[in-house]
Amino acid sequence: FNNTGSLVICFDEEHRPALEELYQRGLSNHVPGLRIVEKEELHEMEPELSDQAVCALYAPTAGVVDPFTLAISMAENAADNGVEFFFNTPVETIEKTETGWLVNGEFETKLFVNAAGLEADDLHNMVCEEKIHIRPRRGEYFLFDKDAGKMASHVLFQQPTAAGKGVLITPTAHGNL
């Protein structure tokens, strides 16, 4: 875990109330150290940031991990603690039992992890009364050379809109962007 902190950037004074609403939501979720930074401090924190940025929501406890190493470590830890993996085994049915769950009429378990990605709603809807629907969003990732890693030291988010999070810039655990 690299503790980089994150900034949600506001590019227009008209959008400041929405940023302050995000700040209030963070406070109610007990995000430590959360604060709004003004233009001068923001540009001291991120000198390469556009001059159009007027303020930002700063979360000093945010950070980045290497997702591949994290996933492998979690799987290794789970295996060390007796978890059994059933790869390439689609879940077709889940039934609640007195002691847990019966999956596909074959596997009995006290717990199961919903790691179905974009199909997680299908699995959720098999076991929960309240139904959900995941609406996937397309995105693109660009991985820059380590030389570009010096251009940003925090995770940088555009202020979210109804359409989504927009573009974000994330330093990697290995020093890239």
Regions inferred by a protein language model and the residue ranges of each:
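Dinucleotide-binding Rossmann-like beta1-alpha1 core, especially the glycine-rich loop
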Residues: F1-M45, G166-V167
